[in-house]
Regions:
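Long, charged N-terminal interaction/targeting segments
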Residues: 1-59
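Short loop/turn motifs enriched for small/polar and acidic residues
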Residues: 32-36, 65-69, 110
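Generic structural signal for residues in well-ordered beta-strands
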Residues: 59-64, 97
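Flanking scaffold residues of small Cys/His-coordinated metal-binding clusters
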Residues: 67-68, 83-84, 102
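Cys/His-enriched microdomains
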Residues: 71, 87, 105
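Short cysteine-rich clusters marking metal-coordination/redox-active sites
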Residues: 73-76, 89-92
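Cys/His-rich microdomains that often coordinate metals
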Residues: 79-80, 96
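Short microdomains enriched in Cys/His and/or Lys/Arg
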Residues: 91-113
């Protein structure tokens, strides 16, 4: 379960942000997780509960923003929802491998106090 190592790193980075701000603890963390990132939001939440124990983030909340995958059709010059990195444009039926969103796995913000 790679979500544990992902969240361990997120906690480390959040605590680094708190130290840089001169704050004693992390009070919240917002993540952006793409539907094609390979990370499972429920597993990230479980891992969060495990890895934040006995850290300055022990009482912090976690918010996960799901980012749906979107591809770009060069022929139509339009973005469309897609299931994977190679999908058929619903307008012109050309296939596109130009994935614009969906692979995100990033810290959107850290709240400290």
């Amino acid at each position: 379960m790679h979500e544990v190592s992902i969240m361990a790193e997120a906690v480390r980075l959040a605590m680094e942000s708190a130290r840089a701000a001169g704050a004693p603890r992390v009070t919240g963390l917002r993540l952006r997780v793409g539907s094609l990132s390979g990370a499972v939001p429920e597993a990230l939440r479980f891992a969060w509960d495990v890895v934040r124990c006995e850290t300055p983030a022990a009482e912090a909340w976690l918010e996960i923003e799901s980012v749906p995958a979107a591809c770009w059709c060069a022929k139509c010059r339009a973005e469309f929802a897609c299931e994977n990195g190679l999908s058929e444009c619903p307008r012109c039926h050309e296939f596109s491998g130009d994935l614009r969103r969906g692979r995100e796995l990033e810290i959107a913000s850290v709240e400290v106090n």
